[in-house]
Amino acid sequence: MTVHIHPSVDHGVKQGSGHFAGGTLVCKCHDRPVKVGIKGDVAHNHACGCTKCWKPSGATFSVVAVVPRQNVTVLENGDKLKIVDASAVIQRYACTGCGTHMYGRIENTGHPFYGLDFIHPELFQEQGSAAPGFAAFVSSVIESGVKPEQMGEIRARLKELGLEPYDCLSPALMDAIATHVAKAKAA
């Protein structure tokens, strides 16, 4: 049985162009789609197993990356955007028509990822953004209904795709969080 991770990686992870200049994210609406402009390439692109991230129907994981918040601009139909959960650390702006999360923003200036917005690169009209490089919060897919006994197969499939599975973030991102906390304590 084939383990499905996400439509954008199920047939292999497609590498980015290495010179992606940005593009336009488009929601799934046929009428008045929300469009969000992104300047530059994405960073820390990964498969995410958390239950907060938007994912297409049938996907076990979302695919999410970050970009500097100043590189995100709502271009069209921003009146259709609404925050999904105002109490969440990441304020996810979703289209009220189709439910697609267009971007997520952290407003807490003390948060280690303040200044980075979370986006779903599969929504780009253009091709070539940086490819996913790891999988985060892998065990969390159990919370979304995956049977615990399937986890071995899921982790094996992620590794087969070249997406090292972590039950938190990647070591580089965990180091960045710890560095931020240490600097804040020293201040």
Curated annotation (Swiss-Prot):
E.C. code: 4.4.1.22
A Pfam short name: GFA
* Claim: Amino-acid biosynthesis is one of the keywords in the record: no
Q: Where does Zn(2+) 2 bind?
A: 48, 50, 53
What is one GO biological process annotated to this record? formaldehyde catabolic process
What are the binding positions for Zn(2+) 1 in this chain?
27, 29, 95, 98
GO MF, one annotated term: S-(hydroxymethyl)glutathione synthase activity
Q: Can you quote the record's cofactor note? A: Binds 2 Zn(2+) ions per subunit.
Give start and end of each CENP-V/GFA domain: 20-167
Tell whether Lyase is among the UniProt keywords.
Answer: yes
UniProt keywords (A-Z) are: Lyase, Metal-binding, Zinc
So, what pathway does this thing act in? One-carbon metabolism; formaldehyde degradation; formate from formaldehyde (glutathione route): step 1/3
Catalysed reactions listed for this entry: S-(hydroxymethyl)glutathione = glutathione + formaldehyde
Annotated coiled-coil segments of the chain: none
List the Gene3D superfamilies hit by this protein, alphabetically: glutathione-dependent formaldehyde- activating enzyme (gfa)
Q: Which cofactor does it need?
A: Zn(2+)
Q: Record's family? A: Belongs to the Gfa family.
PANTHER family this protein is in? CENP-V_GFA DOMAIN-CONTAINING PROTEIN-RELATED, GFA DOMAIN-CONTAINING PROTEIN
Q: Which NCBIfam families would you find in this protein's record? A: formald_GSH (TIGR02820), PRK05417.1 (NF003829)
Function of the protein: Catalyzes the condensation of formaldehyde and glutathione to S-hydroxymethylglutathione.
- Name of protein: Glutathione-dependent formaldehyde-activating enzyme
Origin organism is Bradyrhizobium sp. (strain ORS 278)
